[in-house]
Each structure stands twice: as C-alpha cells, then as structure tokens.
Amino acid sequence: MKTLATSAALALGTLLFAPSAHAAAMPLGNYQLLTNRYTTHAWTWAINLCQPDCVDVTATPRPVRMGVEFFGSAHLAGSTYTLVNDAPDGVICWGYTLPAHDVYSWDAVSLAGTVESTFDAGCNGSPGGVNTWTFALERM
C-alpha cells in the first residue's frame, strides 16, 4: 500500500512539475537589439509575457528622437518568434523617412535572427523593394 501511495505521489509530481512544451521560450526582461540595419540609433526591447506562446515587445529607440517607438506581440512557432511591425520610419533617407513593413524572426534560444523590411518606394523616387538585415538580442 505504501509503495502504491509513493508511486501515485511521484506520478502526480511528474505531471505538475514536468518541463512544459514552452521550455524554448526566451527569458523575459530588457534587451539591446544589435543589428547592422541602423547607423543613427539603437533599440531597447522590453519583453513581457502575453500568453504561453507569445511575448509582448515594447521597442524604444535610443536616442528617442531618432526613431518611432513601437509595440507588438511576437508569436512562438516551434523555436522561432515572429514579430510584425508597420514602421512609419522604416526607410531612412537623407532628411526624411518612408514607411516599411518589417517582419522580425528570431530563435528563442540563440536570440539571433533577421528582419525583412518591405517598402513600396525607396529614397529619391527609387522603386520599392525588400531589404534583409541580421540582428541579435542581448540581455541588459
């Protein structure tokens, strides 16, 4: 009888405290976005939980006057997070900016990824296109 009770307790403990399927989720906190995209400013991302397969991102430019803060939810599929942002300042031209549709994708463990930026028009009337940059998130 004692063996049965012990086995039941161990089984219950295994169910309650087993690693979840979300073990690949990134740690919450503040990160510096390291990228080859920007030369005029840097970004800080505050990462908070929004649901089991999602994190909320508050992206703040540094210095603040050099970019437009944005908010979004990054969804986890497998081990990859994806965040979509329609950036009013996604294309930086000499003296002005143009909008772009940015898709950030990064690995939940290595925190390295790419941002693909699609834009309808380029600087000085040049045609639209797609640019891809690499980035990494470094915990602050």
Each model region followed by its residue ranges:
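A short linear-motif detector with a strong N-terminal bias
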Residues: 12, 24-27, 112-117
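Internal, hydrophobic beta-strand segments that form the core of beta-sheet-rich folds
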Residues: 101-121, 137
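N-terminal start-of-chain detector that recognizes signal peptides
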Residues: 4, 75, 107-111
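Generic marker of "main functional regions" within proteins
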Residues: 11-14, 41, 103
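Secretory targeting and sorting signals
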Residues: 1-23
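Central antiparallel beta-sheet cores of small beta-barrel/beta-sandwich binding domains
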Residues: 25-27, 32-99, 125-140
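Short, surface-exposed loop and linker segments with low hydrophobicity and enrichment for Pro/Ser/Thr
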Residues: 18-27, 95-96, 101-110
